[in-house]
Each structure stands twice: as structure tokens, then as C-alpha cells.
Amino acid sequence: MTIAIGQEEGRGWFDLVDDWLKRDRFVFIGWSGLLLFPTSYLSIGGWFTGTTFVTSWYTHGLASSYLEGCNFFTAAVSTPANSMGHSLLLLWGPEAQGDFTRWCQIGGLWAFCALHGAFGLIGFCLRQFEIARLVGIRPYNAIAFSGPIAIFVSVFLMYPLGQASWFFAPSLGVAAIFRFLLFIQGFHNFTLNPFHMMGVAGILGAALLCAIHGATVQNTIFEDGDAANTFRAFTPTQSEETYSMVTANRFWSQVFGVAFSNKRWLHFFMLFVPLAGLWTSAIGIVGLALNLRAYDFVSQELRAAEDPEFETFYTKNLLLNEGIRSWMAAQDQPHENFIFPEEVLPRGNAL
């Protein structure tokens, strides 16, 4: 038996904090939690406050709260007024000057929720990195979550930064998001954008892959117990595989002629397809922020400028977008005071 005599090595405050943050508890905190929990709490709390009490009369000329009679679908935390530009709208800034009521009236809650929400999503991504490191697994969950972060940052932050003000970002509400979709189509023709096409292919393709994968696994689960359902027969510590990859491979080989034979490649493909869709959509939105739009595959305006004999022509797509713009603009951008004479508005039977 050996007895070591000596003074215990002193532990610094960083080690003590590290131990406390990573302690095994019902809800893991971690270093990422220092960013995740405060920002998420403030963002979600700000959204509930705004949708319950705060009007959009001074920014959009709209009612947008439960207090004004809105429901879950029509309530929103609306974007700041166009005149605010790209100001951070700090409560103590020159616009509100510490007046909370005035801060809410000019749209300060939207900037508050959007910025804290972005940092909350980043904190959640870092949380997945941190827990993956502690558990000893690869960090692909965190990498996959970069997709939603890219979408949020591009739509709520980068798009309005490329436009005139925060006003043109989506307001934080259900109907408000659909309004933004119509706006993006009418003013940018986003459905004809190849980045949007890649995004649609990625998201719908991922949904198809998810359905096929789930059904195939359920179809090929081994009968490893006599319980009434398959869930009770499964044990999380079993050494053998739960379903037959060989049988699944044989099935899809017969159906399509080709099939995945490697689980790693199969699941990486299921990670790659939706993530590629999310990222390409985000890149497309950044393009819209810079007004890199294409109203048609070949711009009629450019051709008309080069060829004096070329006559521009309407397509149903152009007419539809023109209708969206003229229908939305007057109410959607009240600060512009648009007034359209009846003779220039698209007629209802023009399609």
C-alpha cells in the first residue's frame, strides 16, 4: 500500500464552472446553454408579448395583436417602419430613447425577437456539437441543423439588409409568413429561380426518402419477441440489428433494379438531400436581397433594348406577378402612398 503525501492541486474557477455546467441533470446546460437559454427565452417571450399586446398601426397600419381582436393566424410581431432603415432599434437608442411604449410602437420587438432568435438557433446548434462531443458521437446532427440556421438568417436578416429596411423582412406570424411568400413571388418571381427549384427538390425529395426509409425499416424488422407490438420486443442494448438490410436491399432491387447496399451511404444521402435543399434556398434568398431576379429566362427588357423590332409579350406568369404587385403594394407599403388608377390594374378575367 502506497500513501502519497502532498497538497491537492488547486482548481481554477474555469474548471469549477465547467464541472457545474456539464453536470448530469434532467436538462443539460453546458457552455452552449449560456447562449441558448437566455436568447431563446427572450425571443419567445418577446413574441408572446408582441402578439398579445402590441399593435402594428404605427408601422404597417394594421392590427396585429390578440388585444385588437386578432387570432393565432393573424397575430404577429410586425417589422419596424420603413423609416427606421436598418437600425438595431435598441431600447436605449436614439429612436425610442428608453421609452418602452414608443419602442414597441416603432417595431423594436421585431428586431429584438429576430436577433435573439438567430443567436438562439446558433446556441441550439452548438448544444448539439457539445453533447455529441461529451457522448462520443459524430457531430452530424449539428451540421444538419446548419440548414435551418441558414434559412432563418438569410430570410429574416440578410434579405432585409439587402433591401431598403427591416420593413421588408417577414413579420413574425402565420399570415405574415404567407404574405411574405406572395411578396417574394410577386416582386422577385422566386418560383422561376433555380435556387428555389433546388430547394423544392431537396425538401420534397427528403420527405419522400423519409417515408420510404421508415416504411422499409418497419417492413423488415426482425420478429425478435412475442409481444403484441414491435416496440416492446425491441431492446436498446441488443447486439444484433433490428431490421434486415439484406431483405430491404433485395426488395428495392426488385422494385427499381438498384438499391442502397450500404447503411452509411443511405443515411448520409438522407442527410445530404434536405440539407442541400435548405442551403440552396438560403443562397437564393441572398440573391433576392441583392435583387438578382429573373422575370423570365431571357429578359425581354434587355432584348427590347438591343432589338428595335422586338415586341415584348405577356406570359401568364408575368401577368400573375403584376397582379400580385398591384394588389399588394398599396396596402403592403402604406408609407409609399401608392394610388393606382383603375385602368392600369389587371382585370379579373385577364388570365
Swiss-Prot record:
Keyword tags: Chlorophyll, Chloroplast, Chromophore, Electron transport, Iron, Magnesium, Membrane, Metal-binding, Oxidoreductase, Photosynthesis, Photosystem II, Plastid, Thylakoid, Transmembrane, Transmembrane helix, Transport
SUPFAM superfamilies from the UniProt entry: Bacterial photosystem II reaction centre, L and M subunits
Compartment(s): Plastid, Chloroplast thylakoid membrane
Binding site for chlorophyll a ChlzD2: 116
Family annotation (Pfam families): Photo_RC
Membrane association type: Multi-pass membrane protein
UniProt binding sites for a plastoquinone: 213, 260
Catalytic activity annotation: 2 a plastoquinone + 4 hnu + 2 H2O = 2 a plastoquinol + O2
The protein's name: Photosystem II D2 protein
Taxonomic lineage from the root: Eukaryota, Cryptophyceae, Pyrenomonadales, Geminigeraceae, Guillardia
Gene this protein is translated from: psbD
